[in-house]
């Protein structure tokens, strides 16, 4: 089987994976269920590989998947303006150069204690 169903329809599953991938790129570490962590590892590694390529086509492919969310906002006192960085800009300017010498294996999954409500196996997925 090429993917996990995760108890959702295909459109819901794709939306959830896009959201989790974007959240991981912004925060660099998230807590989720073990199955979701294993599933988003594939897409995050693909996005970082696109970021390492760095050309226009790779940027457009990544933009088609990663949500257009603000990763950080900075205030410049001199110009009295706010500057914001999107998740896509962070991927190409900060994350991809960090892994320039690394061939794959950009994420780490750490298993944690089960969730309190339903005892679902939980995990922390983070960028190495």
From Swiss-Prot:
Which PANTHER family has this protein been placed in? Answer: LARGE RIBOSOMAL SUBUNIT PROTEIN BL17M, RIBOSOMAL PROTEIN L17
Q: Does the keyword Transcription apply?
A: no
Membrane-spanning residues: none
Give one GO molecular function term.
structural constituent of ribosome
Write one Pfam family the protein is assigned to. Ribosomal_L17
Name it.
Answer: Large ribosomal subunit protein bL17
For this protein, the record's InterPro entries field holds: Ribosomal_bL17, Ribosomal_bL17_CS, Ribosomal_bL17_sf
Q: Which gene encodes it?
A: rplQ
